[in-house]
Amino acid sequence: MFYVTYKMQRAVTAQQINIFDALYGNLPIQLDNQVNQMWYITTQVENPRPIPRLQESLTNLLRVIKTMTNDNPNQYEHFRIPKATHGFRDIYAPAENLKAAQRLIVNWMQTTCKTLPNNAAHAYVPERSALTACKVHQANESKWMLKIDLKDFFPSCTGDFVFSQLKKIYPYCLLSDDSLRELLRFCLLNDALPQGAPTSPIITNTIMIPYDYAIQKKLMSFDEVHYVYTRYADDLLISSKIKFNYNGVVRYLEELLPDNLKIKHEKTRFGSTSGQNWNLGLMLNKDNNITLGYKEKQRLRAMINSLLKDYTNDIKWSAEDRHHAQGKLAYLRYIEPEYHDGMTAKYEQKYGVSIKDALK
């Protein structure tokens, strides 16, 4: 069985269907009464159209990237960065020539294969973000959230798993096994997707298509609860307007997910949306507005106060601390621009200096 992508009529979002859904017209949307269903399937399904010289394009790509990398796909620098909570995250940064080759692979997947991630995926997708994911739950006026993390997501995506998943996705299912495995050689490190490679995000979003689709389809089958599902890389968020049996949902996900993708149970959270951060620090307040939350904004106010106070006393923060502060403020401006502008203006007026100068 393989999965295809179609664009929803008069919309920019996309959905996945398996081939049997397409044949039998089981589309997860309401069709207009004036639209003939078979016409809709044959004209709106986006990717089953033949892709001219697909295999040839991959052969040419492999020739180029082998030359660029001297046929050496194992050129990485390893370093660790602290996680937001505790512990460290392993990052593998490819050498410049390998990174350039991987960007060619990403471009080939986007422009030649044209496989769109499921509309539930919000990480590493143009015009999608943690904010757009949160807006999906906001639009549903969800009051109860289930947050699930997948354990060691990128390292768990082994070469065989990635290969078998891509063979279920159009048009990768049309490629020869040898050429597809050869392509993956330049995307893997120690037989897994390395976090830090340009290719890893688009590959994970692609291989998760069947699972994103299956989760959405299963959740839609429950009559008693209307669920909303989004995924941000390895963070799965399921919400509803009413309290639901989250243990049953977790059990279903454990049955659906493959053996190599394990749920990190110690990080599973369930509760009401009020007063808790659910998606990369974002939350829905009692008025159903997206916010960073009172505690995070309190920390930001203290940070800006300390920054400007030090600056007026000729104490300059380190480049690392200034970069960290810039990132925090940029995220606040993205999520709550009015609050950002009001807060920064208040402290600039208090100290008589600009935050921009203090962060130079």
What are these regions (language model features)?
Residues M1-A197, I202, T206-M220, F244-K360:
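Right-hand nucleic-acid polymerase module
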Residues D223-E224:
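Active-site-adjacent structural elements in folded domains
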Residues Y227-R231:
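Short beta-strand
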